[in-house]
Amino acid sequence: MLAGVLNHSIIKRFGRADNGDIYVFSPSYAKTMADKRQQTTLDAGVVRIKAGTEEFDPDYYYSIEAQTGGKSFIRCWHITGDYFLLLMYDRSLTETGFTANQLAIYKGETGKLTYVTGLPSADLISGFGNTPYVENGYAYMAVTTTEGYPSIYKIDPVGAVATKGVSIEATQISGVGKLQPQN
């Protein structure tokens, strides 16, 4: 059952690390509910199900908000090992006008979140591709800005560093991938 869910999430908020551990990311959207009975006081955070078990690890919880000054995220993707790429909001969900214009790397084993450097200034970013392309331990993400053409950035999860690659003469890039020849 869990394997099917891992492969069919509409908005990805969990993933399996290479060692089989499953990380579940909660953006804590319930903070924004109008009905007080539905609201939560819990931070956006991460819990884990260790490989070979079916229960949440009672000793594992890391607050995303504690590491970001109260910011949350909209989605996440597994890159390699226990590294995950998160699409981050620019402010707390309890504020108005928040937008997802930043990327961060989450390291499962340590629970550390690090913002990706090497990207254009967040105030210039108008969008990201729908899903990164992942190959050989790197994520490739389309980044659209309000100045110039969109570009593909190669993201090294270990250093949380993005390197600008090719720019495309277009207004937006929704995704990036690689074609393989069929035999």
PLM ranges: what are they?
Residues 149-183:
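Hydrophobic, glycine-enriched assembly/anchoring segments
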Residues 1, 37-54, 99-111, 152-160:
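Beta-propeller blade signature
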Residues 4-14, 66-80, 123-133, 168-182:
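Repeated scaffold domains used in trafficking and secretory/extracellular systems
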Residues 24-43, 86-100, 144-145:
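Short, conserved, GDST-rich strand-edge loop motifs in beta-rich repeat architectures
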Residues 66-127, 154-162:
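C-terminal structural cap/anchor segments
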Residues 1-52:
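Long, internal scaffold/assembly segments composed of regular secondary structure
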Residues 19-21, 80-83, 135-138:
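Short coil/turn segments that connect the beta-strands within blades of beta-propeller domains
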Residues 1-2, 51, 56-66, 112-121, ...:
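Beta-propeller fold detector
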